[in-house]
Amino acid sequence: EVRPKYEIEVLSVHEAMPGHHLQIALAMELDLPNFRKYGGITAFVEGWGLYSEGLGYDLGLYKDPYSRFGQLTYDMWRAIRLVVDTGMHYFDWSRQDAINYFLDNSAKTKQDVMNEVDRYINWPGQALAYKIGQLKILELREKAESELGNNFDIKDFHHEVLKRGALPLDILEKYINDIC
């Protein structure tokens, strides 16, 4: 598989720092029961990965137009998943309908789009977790910023999100509400 160069920076942020590498390294140090250590909460795990892509701006990354384009196309790709997966599994879209929508609304290659659509056919709902998780983390961050005002600290917020390992989003929301 070949990826365009404009995806390199955002992919690195998602998979490495501050994305999954950071998230999983911290989780592996926690004293959690095995079912929590080795089971996954996709909306949390991939939601953090997608949320972290946006942190690239805060970290001074995406300095050139191509890197910014890469981040924006990745975010759009995850939003398209919401439409395409729902279209196929609720509105009875055909595989070709899904491919056409994806091609019309993304920067992905035809081969990438076909692979993605086949993934959604074989694993209904899974790909939705990325965007749903990201949106929940962003919602919780906005709430914490609003409630805490000048006392809001982004590092403390991220610590609060990650310090218990992967959680169902409603449980994460409870913990964030407790600090607000």
Predicted regions, residues:
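N-terminal maturation segment of proteins
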Residues: E1-C180
